Amino acid sequence: MITVFTPSYADDRNTNAQNLTVKEVVARMDPSRFRVVMLGAGVSDPRIAGRSNTRVLPWRKHGNTARILLHLLTHVPDAYFFPREGPLDAAFLAARASLRLRSALVTYVVSGGLSEQSDRPILMRAIREGDVVAANSVHMSRTVESLGGRDVRTVYDGIDRRYYYPSGERKIQQMRLTVLFAGSFRHYKRADLVVREAAKHPEVDYRLAGAGEEESACRQLAESIGCNNVNFLGHLTALQLGEEMRRADILFFPSEIEGHPQVLGQAAACGLPCVARNSYQPDYVVDGMTGVLAGSDGQLGEALSRLIAEPDLRRQMSAAAAKHAAKFEWDRVTGQWQEIMECAIERRSQSRRK
C-alpha cells in the first residue's frame, strides 16, 4: 500500500482550481493500492468521504503547520503530492532534505507568469528537488524545464462530465446572443475588457461569473459608460457554471496571466467557442478550429466581433470544441498520476541508496 499525502482540501464546496484537480484524482485513485491523506476545513466531497483508505486531517484556526508537520514526521508518507507555497510546504521540504525522509516529491506546476526572476522560492525548490515534476500543458512543461525541472511531464487536468457537457438538444436560436466570462475578478483576469467589449455590442448580452477585488470597479465601469447589457452573476457552483455555459454562445476569456485554465476546457466540453490569449498557449483551444487565440486587446476584440457576426463559424467551432474536449478525461489523467507516484517513489528510493 502506497501512502500519499497532499496539502489539498477535500471540502466539497472548495472550488479552488488546484483543489478541484486533486479531488478529481483522489476520488478515482485505486484504494487497494493508494492510501491518501489530505486536509479538510469543512464537509468533504462525498466521493472522498466514501473512499476507503482515505484520511482527512482537520484544518483549524491555529497551529496547523506544526500539527500537520508532526503528523508527517511520525507517519512519513511515501509521496508528497502537489506541494503548494505555504509554511507547511516549506517546513516539509526542509525536513525532507535534512532528515533524508523517504517521501518522494511529486511536483505539479499549474500557475502562469513564471520566470527565473519569479519571487517564489518554495515553488522553485519544489521544481528543483521534485523526484517527478509535471505541468498542466505543453507550454507550461517547457517553462518549468527552463527553470530547472528535469524530464518534466505534461499531465492535463480532466473535465468533470457531471457538470460540463454539450446541450442534449440542438440549441434554440435566441433573439440575443450571450457572451460569457468566467473567472475570479483579479486585475490580470481583465474582466474590465469584457465590460468594454460589451459597450461595443449593445445587442449582445454579456454575463460575468465570478467574484473578487475587481468586481466593484467593473460594476462602476459598466455604469459609467452606460453599459446596460452586462449581468454580474457572482460566484457560481460547478453545476451553475455548466448551465451558464450551455446557455451561452461564446466564452470570452481575456486573462493575461495563466497556466492552463480549466475554464477553457470546461467551456469546450459544453460546446462553447473560446476567445482567449495566445501568450500561455492553451491546449484546450485549437486556434482557428475550436476558438481563437489572440495576442492583444485589439485582436481579442476583433475575434469576438467576428464570432458574434458569423453564426456558421460559431456552429463549426462549437462542434469542433466538444469533440476536442473529449480528449481530456479524468480516468486517463488519474492513471497517469498513479504511474507517476510509483515512478517517483522508485526514484526517491534509488537516490537515498546512493
Tell where the protein language model's regions lie, with residue ranges:
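Conserved acidic donor-binding segment of nucleotide-sugar-dependent glycosyltransferases
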Residues: 287-298, 306-311
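Short hydrophobic beta-strand element within catalytic cores of glycosyltransferases
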Residues: 273-276
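Carbohydrate-associated surface elements
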Residues: 139, 158
